[in-house]
Amino acid sequence: MQEGKKLLDFRRREMVETLKRYGITNQRVLKAFLEVPRHLFFEVEAWDAAYNDGAYPVGFGQTISQPYTVAFMTSLLVERSPSGKVLEIGTGSGYQAAILDALGYSVFSVERIVALYERAQQRFSRLGLHIACRFGDGTLGWKDEAPFDGIVVTAGAPKAPESLLQQLAENGCMIIPVGGSDAQQMTVIKREEGEFKRELFERFVFVPLVGREGWDDTVF
């Protein structure tokens, strides 16, 4: 058991070194990736794959994103909204939410697939994480808890949902992959003096953001 833990700890350190080689330099982000055991967000039989440099299926057509993707999105957020309340759209395995929690954010997360929502809730409870999670349509956000200093969308959207834009606090930012079903461009939307300013970054491939203000689930 102890040898297994040592191996997983070693592989987590290796993962962080890989993130550095890929250009992730924010020390707060790297520290969070060292602190959060990624394998605990996988089923036990998949622990060997937890620190591989790739996405991994979690069921229901969803994935836990590649470590670099999570780190890249998190870095974009930390550099623009270093503290406060963050809304995550697409809880999935719960790993991204746990990274945000380790960074000291007050984290709220919405998941549209009930089985993933329940599984994430159980993980958060077991790990002692104080993350607010609800089942629902993520494209509509969490109006009762708005405004948010940051919004992180972990699925590809045809455009930024208007409901999410309106739930951004002044000087808050949204990190969202926007584009078609084949690939999406990572986009940062900053709210300044009531206007929304966009920055465009590299392209990624995400599962679709399904919901009233996203994709229709019958399309995929």
UniProtKB/Swiss-Prot annotation:
Its EC number is 2.1.1.77. InterPro entries: PCMT (IPR000682), SAM-dependent_MTases_sf (IPR029063). The active site is at S65. CDD domains: AdoMet_MTases. It catalyses: [protein]-L-isoaspartate + S-adenosyl-L-methionine = [protein]-L-isoaspartate alpha-methyl ester + S-adenosyl-L-homocysteine. It is an enzyme of class 2 (transferase). Transmembrane segments: none annotated. GO terms for cellular component: cytoplasm. Keywords: Cytoplasm, Methyltransferase, S-adenosyl-L-methionine, Transferase. One of its GO terms (molecular function) is protein-L-isoaspartate (D-aspartate) O-methyltransferase activity. Coiled coil: none annotated. GO terms for biological process: methylation; protein modification process; protein repair. Its main location: cytoplasm. It is found in: Cytoplasm. It comes from the Bacteria. Belongs to the methyltransferase superfamily. L-isoaspartyl/D-aspartyl protein methyltransferase family. Catalyzes the methyl esterification of L-isoaspartyl residues in peptides and proteins that result from spontaneous decomposition of normal L-aspartyl and L-asparaginyl residues. It plays a role in the repair and/or degradation of damaged proteins. This is Protein-L-isoaspartate O-methyltransferase. The gene is pcm.
